[in-house]
Amino acid sequence: MNAVITVVGKDKVGIIHGVSGILNENNVNILNISQTIMDGYFTMIMLTDISNSTKDISSLKEIFKEFSLKNSLDISVQHEDIFNSMHRI
């Protein structure tokens, strides 16, 4: 099962490190990643494989919610199918 993780916030040191560390701790594999800085704002989208994760998607959402609050970021974790259906033209 795949999940899409999006991260947006003011750019600062350690965002990718923090997000990838959470994924590593929970055995989540990054399949694809795109990130950019736009006028001082960090944006990243990741496609991840959560099939072998030690946590279910709801638990991962809670972990990222806590991380996002501590770091003033907007982080979304969605099942790939939900993400795709929400972003169709």
From Swiss-Prot:
Signal sequence segment: none
InterPro entries hit by this protein: ACT-like_dom_sf, ACT_dom, UPF0237/GcvR_regulator, UPF0237_ACT
CDD domains cross-referenced by the UniProt entry: ACT_1ZPV
Gene3D superfamilies per record: 3.30.70.260
Database matches in SUPFAM superfamilies: ACT-like
One Pfam family, short name: ACT_6
Highest taxon of the lineage: Bacteria
Domain spans labelled ACT: 4-84
HAMAP family: UPF0237
Family note: Belongs to the UPF0237 family.
NCBIfam families (alphabetical): PRK00194.1
Protein name, UniProt field: UPF0237 protein CPE1496
